[in-house]
């Protein structure tokens, strides 16, 4: 059998270029890296990247750099054409990102490329299209800003195997974000943005005036930025300088985040990474890694940048000595970091099972299991030693001393029945004293609470929040207004009367559906079965659920509570009635005098604005009274406020600002009128720290009242507000993310730390 020698042929230039392009441009992220470096070489200060389908369908990168001269557009996409290098010796002193002239050429061999560019001295921009490195047609003049816009379409359209291998657009988009994010951190004086085509919000966005730490925070989050240590060292003997940021011993992740720039070029160094991680091994838990952002500036003649087609590797002289010097400096910075740790509370979903998946067992459950003979052993760290159904004695000791405006006195029977067909269900209630700002508006210092059931147009559907597992649903009635007899609600809201109006108004029903859709059942279960621990201050309180302790934002939760009551009990509120009318003009003047109003002389005289507010609210008086029980008479006096929860009166110090915001912040002419009005009412009724008097201000009046609580607002928070949370609040999902519900401790975790329970 004879073998015939193969014929050696010269490859076609197109084949050669396409093979080379496959080495340089391995995926969309490589193309964006090369073009981003071109933008930086062009002295750009604003770089915008838009992609579609992970960059496989479209890549668009725009800068405001120097642009490309019209004369150079003919050869800009040919191989080995560059403005940064002339002789081979220039490589020894190269300081730019590009030097071979292969990037645009390689991209044009595997995609359709269009370049639109304008120089500072050019009268107009020029657009040109390229394929296989060649100009398709003479450049055409067009409108454009200074800089360059490169559009890359159908990447790897002629390399089918490569395109099939890159079949996950989301993965490719993630790599694009990673590349641009790293360059944005290293170039803190330049604005970067990356977004998908058609999206309005950028996934990466940095500002030109942002610092390096700001950009790290924007890309990697606060968890990294607040644990950074600045590093820096220099060795003239080795001709190198190092600086950057590394994470301290408080921060660790499962995968090392290593940003390395050598002479401002993004590269990789497995040896340097291994050396630094060896230092961190003494400080971080096993199988966790640090965040590292290092900049090495080495004398250019000591660096060989022409090592790899993608330029992600470089070689340099004295590598071992430089790595050892960097390792020693980082070790000195971390020295002593192991002496302390800082722990941050994070928002956790209440009620989720622990890592072991073991169910939490209460003491009542222990008794039942022992009687049934199950024989299950319950560990101390699993026991729940409280019962949310237990009542406290002080729940029956409502404060009777001089109290805050938000604390009602004991009910006083009354005979008012106007507007209500059910006289037997009416109640009256007074408050001993209005706050100091109210004294200027009304000489009288008492409020009467009167249950008023109107009989007009649109009202709230019946709901049963106290029934376990119940959900709020809209009623299918055809008419906009109906009356319902024998409402089965027996809870705390003011609309608990035998006769109710039923709503079918689309705007209100949609708000109810929105509340249902954003509700979080796990949070609801926690609030329904919580055990109140105590108030930290008027804004924060502690509550226990099973074996976990939570810190709850009373202000935000009460605001959401009152908003939901206003929406679900729409037009079914009782009335807190002032026995003597309070002028709206005086309220408006008090509000405008407050810095919170933001009034300036440019807004005009306060008296004129106050008169406008009075006249405006008088026009809305009928709707306010019918739907929200905010009663205003013909003379412009406030005579009633809605009764949302039994035995609760809002902090009346906020009434002037509430009146002002009713006239200025509510979208009266928009479809969102009911929503914005309800939100303003909810803010007014919520527990707010600035309106709660301190104990020192009340000690003189309360010292002679034995048996009464020292701080009546605490009684209100525990026995009125948090009691209402159990049955009336469907907490939204965002409460698990925005810090309004924080898990502070978990009994099993505490037992691991202290080795006892």
UniProtKB/Swiss-Prot annotation:
NCBIfam families: mutl (TIGR00585). GO terms for biological process: DNA damage response; DNA repair; double-strand break repair via nonhomologous end joining; female meiosis chromosome segregation; homologous chromosome pairing at meiosis; homologous chromosome segregation; intrinsic apoptotic signaling pathway in response to DNA damage; isotype switching. GO terms for cellular component: chiasma; chromosome; condensed chromosome; condensed nuclear chromosome; late recombination nodule; male germ cell nucleus; MutLalpha complex; nucleus. Component of the DNA mismatch repair (MMR) complex composed at least of MSH2, MSH3, MSH6, PMS1 and MLH1. Heterodimer of MLH1 and PMS2 (MutL alpha), MLH1 and PMS1 (MutL beta) or MLH1 and MLH3 (MutL gamma). Forms a ternary complex with MutS alpha (MSH2-MSH6) or MutS beta (MSH2-MSH3). Part of the BRCA1-associated genome surveillance complex (BASC), which contains BRCA1, MSH2, MSH6, MLH1, ATM, BLM, PMS2 and the RAD50-MRE11-NBS1 protein complex. This association could be a dynamic process changing throughout the cell cycle and within subnuclear domains. It comes from Rattus norvegicus (Rat). Belongs to the DNA mismatch repair MutL/HexB family. The lineage of its organism: Eukaryota, Metazoa, Chordata, Craniata, Vertebrata. It is found in: Nucleus; Chromosome. Residues 362-375 have a biased composition (Low complexity). GO terms for molecular function: ATP binding; ATP hydrolysis activity; ATP-dependent DNA damage sensor activity; chromatin binding; enzyme binding; guanine/thymine mispair binding. This is DNA mismatch repair protein Mlh1. The modification N-acetylserine is found at residue 2. The modification N6-acetyllysine is found at residues 33, 241, 361, 377.
């Amino acid at each position: 059998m004879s073998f015939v020698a193969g014929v050696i042929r010269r490859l076609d230039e197109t084949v050669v270029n396409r093979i080379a392009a496959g080495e340089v441009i391995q995926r969309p992220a490589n193309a964006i890296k090369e073009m981003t470096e071109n933008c930086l070489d062009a002295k750009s200060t604003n770089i915008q990247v838009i992609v579609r389908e992970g960059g496989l369908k479209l890549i668009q990168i725009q800068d405001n750099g120097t642009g490309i001269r019209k004369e150079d557009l003919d050869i800009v996409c040919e191989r080995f054409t560059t403005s940064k290098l002339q002789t081979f010796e220039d490589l020894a002193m190269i300081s730019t990102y590009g030097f071979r002239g292969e990037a645009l050429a390689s991209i044009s061999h595997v995609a359709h490329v269009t370049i639109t560019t304008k120089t500072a001295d050019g009268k107009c921009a020029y657009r040109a299209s390229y394929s296989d490195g060649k100009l398709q047609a003479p450049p055409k003049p067009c409108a454009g800003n200074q800089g360059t816009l490169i559009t890359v379409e159908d990447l790897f359209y002629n390399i089918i195997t490569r395109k099939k291998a890159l079949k996950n657009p989301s993965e490719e988009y993630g790599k694009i974000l990673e590349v641009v994010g790293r360059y944005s951190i290293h170039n803190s004086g330049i604005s970067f943005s990356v977004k998908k085509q058609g999206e309005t919000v950028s996934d990466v966005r940095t500002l030109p005036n942002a610092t390096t730490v700001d950009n790290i925070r924007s890309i990697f989050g606060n968890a990294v930025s607040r644990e950074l240590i600045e590093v820096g060292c220099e060795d003239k003997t080795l001709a190198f300088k190092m600086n950057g940021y590394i994470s301290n011993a408080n921060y660790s992740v499962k995968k090392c985040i290593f940003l390395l720039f050598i002479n401002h070029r993004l590269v990789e160094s497995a040896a340097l990474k291994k050396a630094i991680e060896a230092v961190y091994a003494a400080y971080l838990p096993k199988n966790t890694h640090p965040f590292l952002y290092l900049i090495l500036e080495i004398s250019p003649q000591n660096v060989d940048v022409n090592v790899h087609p993608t330029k992600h590797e470089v070689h340099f002289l004295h590598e071992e000595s430089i790595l050892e010097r960097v390792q020693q400096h980082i070790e000195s910075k971390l020295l002593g970091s192991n002496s302390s740790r800082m722990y941050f509370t994070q928002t956790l979903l209440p009620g989720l099972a622990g890592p072991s998946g073991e169910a939490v067992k209460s003491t009542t459950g222990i008794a039942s299991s022992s009687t049934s003979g199950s024989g299950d052993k319950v560990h101390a760290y699993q026991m729940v030693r409280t019962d949310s159904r237990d009542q406290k004695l002080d729940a029956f000791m409502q404060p009777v001393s001089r109290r805050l405006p938000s604390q009602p006195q004991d009910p006083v029977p009354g005979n008012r029945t106007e507007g209500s067909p059910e006289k037997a269900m009416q109640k009256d209630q007074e408050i001993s004293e209005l706050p100091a700002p109210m004294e200027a508006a009304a000489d009288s210092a008492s409020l009467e609470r009167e249950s008023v059931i109107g009989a007009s147009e649109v009202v709230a559907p019946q709901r049963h929040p106290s029934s376990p597992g119940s959900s709020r649903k809209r009623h299918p009635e055809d008419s906009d207004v109906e009356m319902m007899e024998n409402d089965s609600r027996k809870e705390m809201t003011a609309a608990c009367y035998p006769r109710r109006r039923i709503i079918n108004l689309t705007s209100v029903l949609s708000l109810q559906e929105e509340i249902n859709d954003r509700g979080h059942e796990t949070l609801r279960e926690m609030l329904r079965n919580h055990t109140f621990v105590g108030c930290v201050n008027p804004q924060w309180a502690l509550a226990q659920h099973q074996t976990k302790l939570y810190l709850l934002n009373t202000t935000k939760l009460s605001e959401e509570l009152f908003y939901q009551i206003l929406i679900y009990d729409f037009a079914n509120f009782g009335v807190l009635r002032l026995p003597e009318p309070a002028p709206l003009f005086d309220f408006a003047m008090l509000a405008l005098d407050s810095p919170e109003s933001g009034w300036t002389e440019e807004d005009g005289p306060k008296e004129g604005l106050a008169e406008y507010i009075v006249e405006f609210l008088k026009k809305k008086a009928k709707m306010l009274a019918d739907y929200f029980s905010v009663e205003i008479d013909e003379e412009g006096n406030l005579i009633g406020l809605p009764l949302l929860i039994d035995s609760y009166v809002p902090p009346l110090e906020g009434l002037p600002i509430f009146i002002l915001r009713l006239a200025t912040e509510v979208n009266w002419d928009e479809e969102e009128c009911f929503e914005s009005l309800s939100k303003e009412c909810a803010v007014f009724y919520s527990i707010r720290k600035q309106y709660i008097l301190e104990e020192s201000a009340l000690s003189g009046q309360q010292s002679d009242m034995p048996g009464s609580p020292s701080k009546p607002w605490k009684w209100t928070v525990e026995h009125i507000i948090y009691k209402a949370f159990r049955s009336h609040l469907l907490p939204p999902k965002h409460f698990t993310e925005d810090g309004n519900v924080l898990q502070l401790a978990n009994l099993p975790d505490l037992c691991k730390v202290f080795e006892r329970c």
